[in-house]
């Protein structure tokens, strides 16, 4: 079968290879891939910045945003049958089975020994077929066929926003306004979730107000700003007191600014990674004083587990019901598996690129 693979640590090594089609064990499911999403992680893998091949392999099949259909279920599998739509979770428990992993929360793993399909120590989903244990597969209703490939990134934001509301149980909290920094796929999904729970939401990016990102945001009643024209500080002034900020750019500078722009008793959720180790001058006393005197909370979030995927199904359904067809507009480009390298070449209008694998 065909698969998209890299040599970990080697720049621009992405290529399509031929590998044996996997065979499911008695307790496994064989899934035929339909499509995979491309994200910044895949770009970092191809740049050689991150990535770890499975033990005994010199290559890594990439792909973690996925949608497939059950081709065959092992004889001991009862939960799935041929033709079922499924999305697979990504992170797997560490070998030492820390407390978080033992309790079904590998996304909160206490060690760095966890595995991630398509990223760290396990082959991913950008292949014609893969096998998986049924407990790692999420059933998808046919009504979500066109957008379910967004479930994995949405699950990450679903987790972050859920945690924010859980943390804010420290008081009686009635949030009204939220700002999402960044309008990429994670940012747009965060903004849509916050709109879905009833908040007034704004977002910003470097694209114009005529861009696809802006049009998607504004179609859901999310106010969009071009940060090149309206600085983040001015956005906060225009929007009024901000109860919550979701940082989805990966800019540490913006992350620190977000703390100061959040209103008293507010919360900042950090979802963006900052791998470049840049430094900025920050008044650390000012940050500490602001956090303490105004009861602010800041936390980071990464990955997700089965619970967030399952809740994500309900969220996708709700968003589709409220804004029909809006999620599908995020798919700005589609490429075939054999042209996967084209999918990693950025286009100024890209929001989410899909790699089409099967019919």
From Swiss-Prot:
GO biological process: non-phosphorylated glucose catabolic process
Disulfide bonds: none
Catalytic activities: D-glucose + NAD(+) = D-glucono-1,5-lactone + NADH + H(+); D-glucose + NADP(+) = D-glucono-1,5-lactone + NADPH + H(+)
One MF term in the entry's GO annotations: D-glucose binding
Binding positions (NADP(+)): 183-186
Keywords associated with the record: Carbohydrate metabolism, Metal-binding, NAD, NADP, Nucleotide-binding, Oxidoreductase, Zinc
InterPro entries found in the cross-reference section: ADH-like_N (IPR013154), Glc_1-DH_arc (IPR026583), Glu_dehyd_C (IPR031640), GroES-like_sf (IPR011032), NAD(P)-bd_dom_sf (IPR036291)
Enzyme's top EC category: oxidoreductase
Binding site for Zn(2+): 39, 64-65, 152
Domain of life: Archaea
This enzyme's EC code(s): 1.1.1.47
Keyword Oxidoreductase among record annotations: yes
Cofactor field: Zn(2+)
One Pfam family cited in the UniProt record for this chain: ADH_N
Binding site for substrate: 41, 116, 152
Function: Catalyzes the NAD(P)(+)-dependent oxidation of D-glucose to D-gluconate via gluconolactone. Can utilize both NAD(+) and NADP(+) as electron acceptor. Is involved in the degradation of glucose through a non-phosphorylative variant of the Entner-Doudoroff pathway.
Family: Belongs to the zinc-containing alcohol dehydrogenase family. Glucose 1-dehydrogenase subfamily.
Database matches in HAMAP family: Glucose_DH
Protein name per the record: Glucose 1-dehydrogenase
Native source species: Methanocella arvoryzae (strain DSM 22066 / NBRC 105507 / MRE50)
């Amino acid at each position: 079968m065909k698969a998209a693979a890299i040599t970990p640590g080697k720049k621009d090594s992405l290529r399509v290879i031929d590998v044996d089609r996997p065979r499911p064990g008695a307790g496994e499911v064989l899934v035929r891939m339909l499509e995979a999403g491309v994200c910044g992680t895949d770009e970092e893998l191809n740049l050689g910045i991150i990535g770890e091949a499975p033990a005994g392999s010199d290559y890594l099949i990439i792909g973690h945003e996925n949608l497939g259909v059950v081709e065959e279920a092992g004889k001991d599998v009862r939960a799935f049958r041929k033709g079922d739509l499924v999305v697979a979770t990504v992170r797997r428990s560490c070998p030492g089975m820390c407390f978080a992993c033992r309790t079904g929360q590998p996304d909160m793993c206490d060690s760095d020994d966890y595995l991630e399909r398509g990223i760290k120590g396990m082959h991913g989903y950008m292949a014609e077929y893969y096998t998986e244990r049924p407990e790692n597969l999420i059933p998808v209703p046919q009504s979500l066929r066109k957008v379910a490939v967004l479930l994995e990134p949405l699950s990450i934001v679903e987790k972050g926003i859920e945690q924010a509301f859980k943390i804010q149980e420290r008081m009686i909290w009635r949030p009204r306004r939220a700002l999402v920094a960044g309008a990429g796929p994670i940012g747009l999904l965060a903004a849509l979730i916050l709109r879905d729970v009833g908040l007034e939401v704004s977002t910003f990016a470097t694209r114009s107000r005529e861009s696809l990102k802006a049009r998607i945001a504004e179609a859901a009643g999310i106010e969009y700003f071009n940060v090149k024209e309206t600085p983040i500080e001015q956005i906060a002034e225009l929007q009024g007191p901000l109860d919550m900020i979701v940082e989805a750019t990966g800019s540490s500078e913006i992350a620190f600014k977000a703390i100061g722009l959040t209103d008293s008793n507010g919360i900042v959720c950090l979802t963006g990674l900052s791998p470049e180790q840049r430094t900025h001058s920050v008044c650390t006393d000012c940050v500490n004083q602001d956090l303490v005197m105004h009861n602010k909370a800041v936390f980071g979030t990464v990955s997700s587990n089965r619970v967030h995927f399952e809740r994500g199904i309900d969220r996708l359904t709700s968003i589709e019901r409220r804004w029909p067809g809006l999620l599908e507009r995020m798919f700005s480009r589609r490429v075939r598996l054999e042209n996967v390298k084209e999918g990693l070449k950025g286009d100024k209008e890209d929001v989410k690129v899909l790699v089409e694998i099967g019919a």
